[in-house]
């Protein structure tokens, strides 16, 4: 419909500059209202009617022992740091705060990620390995996602101890090796594919797997869903079970941290 969005000059003056350069929400809402009748959104379940179901479940675990002590100590240190800051200091220290929240998330994954001398257990790791062992015994293939490549390295060592075969895909994996591993996983007897969420969340077809485990939840659910869709896509013949491993009763939930 030529002219529906005005001439480019008028569109730029009334929509583009206010919305893009000035972050004018009203201008953006006006544009959305105008184009909404012309936007067709099709859901996967409407297009792929023969695609097996996707069953999602949150698996909750509690911190215990030394891991709980480290978590509490880090939260206390963060609170003291924030209490000492003025409003202006808080505005300029957001990167530092995010870094501290990342450390908190790593403690929840496995304290050994930031404390080299930590030798105690991780409740999350123990639960995850138990889930994988049970799934492997039942003949399933698993996609295991984490945002931390160091966490994937740690999980890989545990898989080796349990004599569970795996592939590993991170941002450093070459394009050629990436393609070869995907092909192999879909045809051989390898049981687990450990994947960095950012490196492997899109562009992979891994329908040999029918179990997906998100070891550390991400704040952007759409990113997690894209990762899940590496298995839940055209070519999948089985119901896909998706598990997100989280801690319960953590103060960090109140501060918006996803653990």
Show where each model-derived region lies:
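Conserved Helicase C-terminal RecA-like lobe
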Residues: 49-72, 86-204
């Amino acid at each position: 419909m030529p002219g529906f969005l005005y001439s480019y000059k008028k569109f730029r003056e009334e929509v583009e500059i206010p919305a893009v350069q000035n972050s004018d929400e009203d201008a953006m809402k006006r544009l959305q209202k105008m184009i909404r009748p012309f936007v067709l959104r099709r859901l996967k379940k409407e297009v792929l009617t023969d695609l097996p179901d996707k069953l999602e479940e949150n698996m909750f675990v509690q911190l215990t022992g030394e891991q709980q002590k480290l978590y509490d100590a880090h939260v206390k240190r963060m609170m003291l740091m924030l209490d000492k800051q003025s409003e202006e200091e808080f505005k300029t220290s957001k990167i530092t705060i995010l870094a501290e929240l990342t450390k908190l998330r790593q403690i929840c994954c496995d304290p050994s990620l930031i404390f080299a001398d930590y030798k105690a257990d991780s409740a999350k790791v123990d639960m995850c390995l138990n889930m994988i062992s049970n799934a492997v015994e039942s003949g399933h293939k698993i996609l295991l996602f984490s945002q931390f490549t160091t966490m994937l390295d740690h999980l890989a060592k545990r898989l080796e101890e349990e004599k569970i075969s795996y592939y590993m895909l991170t941002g450093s994996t070459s394009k050629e090796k990436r393609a070869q591993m995907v092909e192999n996983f879909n045809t051989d007897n390898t049981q687990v594919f450990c994947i960095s969420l950012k490196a492997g969340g899109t562009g992979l077809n891994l329908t040999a797997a029918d179990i997906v485990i998100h070891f550390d939840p991400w704040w952007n659910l759409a990113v997690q869903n894209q990762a899940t869709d590496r298995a839940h896509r055209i070519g999948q013949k089985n119901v896909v079970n998706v598990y997100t491993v989280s801690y319960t009763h953590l103060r960090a939930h109140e501060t918006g941290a996803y653990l």
